[in-house]
Amino acid sequence: MAIRIYSVDQQASGQFDEGNITEQKPIGFPGEGSAVERVGTLFYWAWFQTKREGSLPLHPHRGFEILSYLLEGTVQHQDTLGNEQSIGAGGLQIMQTGTGVQHAEKYGKDTSGFQIWFEPFMGEAYYATPTYADYEDEDFPVEIRNQAKIKTILGTDSPIRIVADAQMWDLTLPAGQSFEQVIPEGYSIAGLVVEGESTWKSGIDTHQVSVNEFVVCEAEQTQNLHIQSKEQTDSRIILIQVPSVLPYPSYKEIKIRIQSKS
């Protein structure tokens, strides 16, 4: 298994609302300078943080499946479908943007979370009816495995169903404790360390990973990934499993096809 570590300097960054909303982007948009441009169906990943209350005005999306997951604070969502909802820490908002939707966001002070885009097959997604849903922390299943706390965001028993092939977990490891995950052949796990330090191991390949670092583990054959928190600190890691390669034509290819027919 190939395990690749990306420092903050190898990730993209951004800001909004006159610098109030800052973003660390493990996977930025094309041209933003992140070392990783996509991992299979995982198209974009930004970790946003606010210093004070802030907002983003109404803006459009089409086709992509976009989720916002909060670590701390609050986010209020408003869209052209008529939705106006708020979530708190541990909550999630998901848009399947289909034929197109516009939305605006308001952020509370000291809010931290992720916006993550998954790419379904746009030959179908561009013509689907857009949808919105939101969930609170208690809506998600939690498993305790060898003292590791595993909250399933996408996957078995999660209330969320998306079209793109993806699973997602919020993993908390007490100091010195470990977690093991089987990665199927042809799949990758992308991980972002939001707290603590940990050791990532597959076979003889071992890496030390610190807070803010981004990890991509690509399984050419079915293999185990072992993650252990350092003895001195707890760790919190967001993990996303997706196909290593997008299994259908990309959104760019679909756009070219659509434009050629118009």
Where are these regions (language model features)?
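Jelly-roll (double-stranded beta-helix
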Residues: 1-262
